[in-house]
Amino acid sequence: MPNIDFVGKRSFFIYLSIALILFSVIVIFVKGFNLGVDFSGGSEIIVSFDKSYTIDELRNGLQTINQEYATAKIIQTNPGGGASDQFFYIITVRDSFPTLEEKQMFINSLEESFSDSSLNIEQFNDVSGYAAREIRSYAWYAVIISLIVLLAYITIRFQFSYGVGAILALAHDVIITLGFYSLFGIEMNLTAIAAFLTLAGYSLNDTIVVYDRIRENRSKNRGMDIESITNKSINEVIVRSLNTSLTTFLVVFMMFLLGGRSIASFAFGLTVGVIIGTYSSLYIASPIVIGMVKRRKKTQKA
């Protein structure tokens, strides 16, 4: 079993976490988020051509339909060639086309703008501004409700101080991960929210492993101070935690690299979240419990 002084260095890591949270908040306020169609409203059209276009050529063609489309988000999803000899692009515009007639008018305009190529509409996803606001609201409600439920669960299973430590650690993980989404311009959509909910469960599981060992060691070593018990407990579970985190990280990182655009937001959130969650379960959740236990003892003595 390793013998690392985790607790002795807790002040450094708490200040480090505060710095990371402040950095994340600043990045979010300065850059904002790259909102997907789910959250911003608009249309996402997957089109295929039998010839290749540059992004600028596509934007110029879209601009002939509507000047605002000059800033459309365009992603090429394959290099073309092979058996199908098709070139696929994802075009995202801020307009929504709620009726079939409006969709068809837009498709006709696309065909006119790119008449030198055979165009096929592979997929047409449309989200109105109202629906986007509803989705965004319900997504964040899901995150907040999950945090409340997790607080109740930890409080019932352990003590209120443990619940506070777990929720603060989870909030720490979510804020820093949000900062990375903003910093790297990763699309914020429903799969990203799924990543945050998955991260909450993963991070909580890691924290519970540590808390369970702390509770067990407190019952066995009643004469030992809380700092020593916490340090002993973390050292007993760290190998398991790091092995689990490493294998999980490798899987989600490969998903991010190779999984394609459809799961990129989800895989990115877990790639960052596994690292931050493992760190917080060792250096944030446990020190918070130490502080609250010592504070409660002082209050009881007074």
Swiss-Prot record:
**Gene Ontology biological-process annotations:** intracellular protein transmembrane transport; protein targeting; protein transport by the Sec complex
The family database entries (Pfam families) matched by this protein are listed as:
Sec_GG, SecD_SecF_C
- Which terms are listed as keywords in the entry? Cell inner membrane, Cell membrane, Membrane, Protein transport, Translocation, Transmembrane, Transmembrane helix, Transport
Instruction: Name where it's found.
Output: Cell inner membrane
Write out the transmembrane intervals: 12-32, 138-158, 166-186, 190-210, 249-269, 272-292
Q: What job does this protein perform? A: Part of the Sec protein translocase complex. Interacts with the SecYEG preprotein conducting channel. SecDF uses the proton motive force (PMF) to complete protein translocation after the ATP-dependent function of SecA.
Q: Which PANTHER family match?
A: PROTEIN TRANSLOCASE SUBUNIT SECF (PTHR30081:SF8), PROTEIN-EXPORT MEMBRANE PROTEIN SEC (PTHR30081)
The subunit structure is:
Forms a complex with SecD. Part of the essential Sec protein translocation apparatus which comprises SecA, SecYEG and auxiliary proteins SecDF. Other proteins may also be involved.
Q: What is this protein called?
A: Protein translocase subunit SecF
**In which organism is this protein found?**
Petrotoga mobilis (strain DSM 10674 / SJ95)
